[in-house]
Amino acid sequence: MNSENPNTLKQSKDHRYLKLLYLCLLVLFSRAESIWAQEQMLSNSEYTFSIARSPMIEALQQFTATTGIQVLFEDGVSGKRETVVLDGTYTAEQALGLLLADAGLSAEPVASQTVRVTLTPRPGDDPFRVASEIEEIIVFGTKQGLGLQRVTDSVELFTAERFEQEVVFDLGEAVTRAVNASVIRNDLNTINIRGLDRFGTDSAGVSQAINIFIDGAPASSNALEGGGQSLWDIGQLEVLRGSQSTVQGRNSIAGSVVVQSKRPDYDWSGAARLRAGEYGSRQYSAAVTGPIVDEQLAFRLSTDYQETDGFVDLGFDGSSSDFRDLWVTRGKLLLEPEALDALSAMLSFEYTDRSVGAAEGAVNAPTPISDPSFSDFDPNDLESFPNLIRSVDYNTTRITSDVAYDLSSEINLRFVGTYEDAEYDGVNGSSLTSSFGQLGSFFFGFTETLTAEFRVEFEYEKWSGIVGAYWFESQQDATVEAVSLITDFAPFPVTPIDSIFSLAVPRETDVENAAFYTQWRYEPNQHWSIDLGLRYDDESYDLRTVAEVPRTAPDECLTNIPGVFVGSEDPFVSLPCSTVAPLFSNPDTPLQSDEFGVWLPRAAVSYHLNDDLTFFVSARRGYRAGGPFIARSDELEVLVDTFDPEFLISYEAGWRGIWLEGRLVLNGTAFYSEYEDQQVRVQDARGFERIDNAGETSLYGLELSSDYKVSETLSIYANLGYLETSVDDFIFTEESDPPLNLAGNELGRSPSTSITFGLNYAAGNGYFAGASANYRSSFYADILNLDEDDLGSGFSERLGSSIMLNARAGYRFDRFTITAYVTNLLDEDEPENVSLAGLADSGAVEVATRPFFNMRQPRAFGASIDFVF
């Protein structure tokens, strides 16, 4: 253990963060100073012009001849536009303004003695239509380069602009704004899409149901745990609802989240942010991008430091419970060499350092609900009484490479390789003076992941699509070491009195996945398109769990450390003599293994009524891999077995529409799914809790999304999610008579209605304001569906409806933006999640010894200053 003072270590880490932040700011402001100098030159130098009314291209050539300032513009910008007569003495900026004003064009400096002319909507133009024609948003998750209005998947899309509008700074918080999706305590390991949790119905299984991709790399659970995923310098976030198994493969039976950070640019630009809010919330961020070799090599560098004291205090001493510190730095290089103009390569590097306490908003009650004193406990007091005080450090390194080569105008080759190393080291320290003498536990481990994907992307006449091969390899090591004082629970006198009992449980998991997949789109004419996809996915698991526990062997004594007890509760053993032996299996025995191969088809047919309206139907098969498990009975018997994959068969229909001459986008998707061979935990008659394919569930629903440009200054959006889930078969325990079946229950965290709504106002004079609301109807916390009748009290695990309202207002200068914001304006206090009780092996209700609640952060005010150049 490190003997340094934790405060000293934190200060040392803070200094590292600030040094990198200062470096980014230094580059940023040096480039800003250069650009300001260019702008000052354009503003102060005067020239005499004599330009007659003429075509735009000729007028700009005369402007260059007079000033020496080069003018850049894209093809089609000049068109048939003509300029006004310009005769007199003006600065370069004034002259350009007069030449371009009536042509719907504007200019901005991009380098020394260089400006770029770009298209801007004229007063009579529809700004929404112009924007959609110039730059249609591409959905990266489909891997086919399709625009949002051309995909048949149900996608909730967030841009950097929407992050600002909704006042969100964390990735998990943003995902919660998607309908039919939720995240607890901003921890993406808790993500739920259409009623399916990331770790399965009741956390059974060894794989996940929802994958998170960050710049093309699948994020491991260790990299996501505890929350704290920065949105700074993120360009786009996609929440894809419904199975993505055919194209994305493993861990995407329920959907996926695709995150893309901003790309390097050949023009110098940058940004910085200073933010402060209640509950000790602070953010210091910077980003800069520019050319290394003009039009051939560009870079982007960003850094973000965020911290919060949290909003839950420990009931024992009032100290912060759910604190969080986050530092992330990201670098990108874009290579597009002139000597090989068909090649484009992107290399990305990201390092994240997080320190977190208890789960955000976690409140533990001091007593069970059966205790009369529980009625005096109010979770909204935001005081927690946990058995153990938690603190964890997470460190994640992520490297990705994306290399594309155009063989021809029809065929493109692409290779995507990723590497991730996610490490963690934490401690649960005891908050109790006497409860089995528990001191706490230490836990540490890592997950190392490698992926490689090669695909051929083609577009030839009426055909387009991809053919790809994928390889994945992951190694995970995790160890939990529990440490307790033996004095209070040993059935015999112990000397010395501080003797320690230790239990270590290491777990090793190795995963390999290989796949071949293809996705084709055929468009026989302008009205019809047919999508066909197929994937063969092969996955293997190796698993070993070894529990090292004390065993007595006085004649083979291996340890003799005064004052330390690692050994038996046998009163005939002379302390501190002991040995350590494995409980579950010998460390030298082979790992428990299993392997599965599945075919995953999908198909869709779309009818394009016109350029603005498309109808579609689709069907697909998703899966989550099976694997091995090791279980222990109450009598310490060991069971080693395997379970099969689970499947989600989905049928969807919907439309994608642009209405009111481009001012309204209205999309809809209806779905019906059959969740088959669910992996669930079953308590069998022998006392083993095994994993079995013993569940079946039906679910259906609807997702609507709309975005309406009311005027030049006002826009609104509204999204609706509807969801119904019904468990058809779920054997919970075989020990009861008859076996307890949860048929008829709802899946946990499946509100029937979810709504998001927002409006944004931006006046031409710099003032702006906006508000967003997020509504969820009531739902059960888990599949047990325990209510007041089950608990025999006024308590229930069905959470009530809730609405979160955020608002912001500010003023935008040329380079600076000042924003004031408030989150949870209505001070909503309905918990995000709750755990009060469970079911025993017999099926009887068991009240939790320490009920816990995941509370929402109360109303909080904050302000930020953003700088761009």
Predicted segments, located by residue:
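Short, acidic, small-residue-rich periplasmic hinge/interaction motif at the N-terminus
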Residues: 60-62, 66-67, 119-164
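Periplasmic N-terminal accessory/gating domains of Gram-negative outer-membrane beta-barrel systems
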Residues: 100-101, 108, 138-144, 150-201, ...
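Membrane-embedded beta-barrel scaffold of Gram-negative outer-membrane proteins
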Residues: 137, 398-406, 412-428, 608, ...
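Outer-membrane beta-barrel translocator/receptor signature
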Residues: 207-209, 221-223, 232-241, 246-315, ...
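Periplasmic-side early beta-strands and strand-to-turn transitions of outer-membrane beta-barrels
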Residues: 258, 266-267, 275, 287-386, ...
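Structural signature of Gram-negative outer-membrane beta-barrels, strongest in the C-terminal barrel
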Residues: 334-338, 342, 456-458, 462-464, ...
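Gram-negative outer-membrane beta-barrel transporters
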Residues: 464, 526, 530, 665-667, ...
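C-terminal beta-signal and adjacent terminal beta-strands/loops
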Residues: 623, 775-784, 810-869
